[in-house]
């Protein structure tokens, strides 16, 4: 970054500072990962200079013969990776991908059934502070109080009562396998369309480690980062019969020109995910998550639903008499990055919370395995047991830094 260093030393310095933070810390935020140098190069390429409103061979600008090929390659690879009938690679984010499906299928004020944010859903699944919750009538289902898994009896009851236009499955903090077939049955019973937001589990789905929603859902949205380990962006997969209205919802409905440099980076992401090594990586993510979950339970932590089937776990800190906010702050002091998170039937503010969310994609990219997961669980326990002991926290921070030095930040 010699040009950047010369032209804008302030931004150069901040990027270097963030790079050092990522190298030094143990990254356990479930939605974060480290991209490869190839993805990074594509995202920083000359394609950022090109405007290309529209779709391949149907552009509103000239000079698109090369970027048409880029977008077509990204589409073909995504279709191969997920087995989709139709693919739109233009959404700038997962949030805009979700918004596009709503815009294409539900009239303003129409009813959508989705998972409650405090039970593991997502902001764009009808939170009242989000655009989705302001423009549509969202009804929310949750998890059972006993087992803390999706309450399908409640889903069915709410669907019958409210007759939604669209039913949404998918979550941002749900550690168990989701049975998409049951959602499909309920949607068919009430005449609703069915959408799955698989942003968190897309990598697992691509590797065959989580049932794919693509054959059963009308629409599937995802991000291209998180477990998929690619550039930040969105993606929509859908049945062929819905292709025109989805494409129209993205452009001209929600967006103007696509980000061709990011679409190129998505194409690289999909190519990497099609390699045999990617499946091994996803298997290690799950194994690491299960190992860490078991070890945390050994230290007395209560895990929502009792464990995990995927890349993340939700830790209820109520029995530790610590808030999620305080835990996040303490762990950040020692170089372990997590996020505070609400738990089902939460009693605290979302700015405080009773839990933390932990994920293993980023540490797995660094090459860490089960042995390191046990060590990290130990360090988490020691940190939260000594939350007010600055001397002990300093010692733990040095242990974290030594661990980080053994595993360079890389996706190669």
From Swiss-Prot:
Q: What are the recorded Gene Ontology BP terms?
A: glycine biosynthetic process from serine; tetrahydrofolate interconversion
**Residues carrying N6-(pyridoxal phosphate)lysine:** 226
Give residue numbers for the site Plays an important role in substrate specificity: 225
Compartments where located: Cytoplasm
Highest taxon of the source? Bacteria
Report the family membership.
Belongs to the SHMT family.
Q: How does it associate, per the subunit comment? A: Homodimer.
As for what it does, the entry says:
Catalyzes the reversible interconversion of serine and glycine with tetrahydrofolate (THF) serving as the one-carbon carrier. This reaction serves as the major source of one-carbon groups required for the biosynthesis of purines, thymidylate, methionine, and other important biomolecules. Also exhibits THF-independent aldolase activity toward beta-hydroxyamino acids, producing glycine and aldehydes, via a retro-aldol mechanism.
Recorded protein name is Serine hydroxymethyltransferase
Species this chain originates from = Halothermothrix orenii (strain H 168 / OCM 544 / DSM 9562)
Name of the coding gene: glyA
